[in-house]
């Protein structure tokens, strides 16, 4: 067994590999970019070496630098994680030539399966069913358009070297083909260095089911059953579960055996995933093989009682697989939710910022937990960030993977809902509320699964903002007034003096004040804020809002956790303050309320309109309009790239482009004006 390995990755997967290596007594070496100098993966490894600037092309994608670090630190093997160089056959080959063990499949297997088009050809030869499409070398746009017309719309374009939902476009009609192809190729070259694409018939209600396979150097190959990854947005997985709901033993065996056959056909070694598109009628088609560990591997670990990273290390060291096919039974049900820094209500745009507060449910991390030979821990959280860390525009905005296990799917669903309610993040937008709606929605609960689930249930998954309840406003008001009291006391020479505090104490009278909090609901209704009238009493307050009056008192407090009594109702909640923003977590919901301090913004003028601004930091990759051009509402004007995903800024109304302020290739800051626009 190895005594030291280098982990050629960052974030959650680097921490995941380090955890298993540590448990096995193996020393670890981390590599990091300048942006990651204070990152968690740097802290958890035994050694860490800087390899370059923030841009992945100058750091995590520099195989020669990584190999040099491995040799200099005495590492015997390199674990690539997922993403970056994990499916780069040239890197795997270079490791072997340098005398390092690449913890993954042989370069030949990666080349065979790494190209989607080559893999499709290979599977066709092996009589594995394929979705109708074009997987050849010809990349002329006119030729590809003719192939798309032949296949029939809707057509799915995919980067041949791609993965993770990047470089994919669904095209509904022929008129949209050329623009979608150009965008797909730009994203493909940016993400994978290869703009080759393939085209396939897009199935309207398919399920995405993948099989975890594992092979060793002794001729053994097994499947560790399936994962259902049908719930996706932008072709990226949101929820994954194992086993797949409604999967019969016969179909499971058929898909598992097909996956093993695919792995054996390319002389596979190590962990791999064979992905299938499954139709509602039970038929399935080969989609691709990922020649690495998957993001969602924990759900397989939880139902099979295995540590897949340990398996990777043992197989790479030349040992046989720890279990046979007969020993790989399914126990219980596991679900994984990917918690991202993103705004689902704004097209899942990434959210850049600092994790000012992060409260999580009680959970194990990077392990099965539970008791040896017994059930695994009910909740697991795999995360590569900590409170205080920044989510930057350079890398994937994942905050954590939340994994739950239950004796059956019903119990797992209940545990997921509860765990999401206990996740509290302040500092940037997240998809937690969206995930909670998704998990609790009737479609997912009833296992009515397919890759269009999110779009089909958009009305319930993306509801319009609702008014904050009086209880949430009361909790914010109490937190505000308590913080004022503490500030006043800290500045007073005699904190007990009623004349020197902010308790609202007045001689012979009850002090009254107005508080104003605003949220997204206020903005959609044209309201400036929720107005709360507060009257200070001897043992609490009386509040009035929206024609409702109620007595209010603070019954208990521990840090940011408040217990209040509002009228006859007792309530509990956590309130985290971030400048003028009060984040109220109560009843499994998160209310972001901005306090409109009457003194803080006195004299400020409203900024002049007429400019379209960048929704996030990123790079301008295309300017589709020109100065002086008249445009229609919805016309694409500028395309930005952030985190290797493209985002189109469109005209908000009919109007005139008066000036363009950035050129292709320019980096722009969040909120930077991109162009001057005059509405008609």
Feature names for model-found ranges:
Residues 1-274, 278-297:
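N-terminal beta-alpha lobe that positions the nucleotide/phosphoryl donor
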Residues 87-94, 336, 346, 449-450, ...:
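Structured, non-catalytic alpha/beta "coupling" segments that mediate domain-domain communication
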Residues 323-331, 455-458, 462, 589-614:
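Long, charged amphipathic helices and adjacent flexible linkers at domain junctions
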Residues 259, 298-549, 670-676:
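Catalytic cores of soluble metabolic enzymes centered on carboxylation/carboxyl-transfer
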Residues 602-680:
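Structured functional modules or segments
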Residues 168-170, 201, 247, 398-407, ...:
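Short, well-ordered beta-strand elements within core beta-sheets of diverse protein domains
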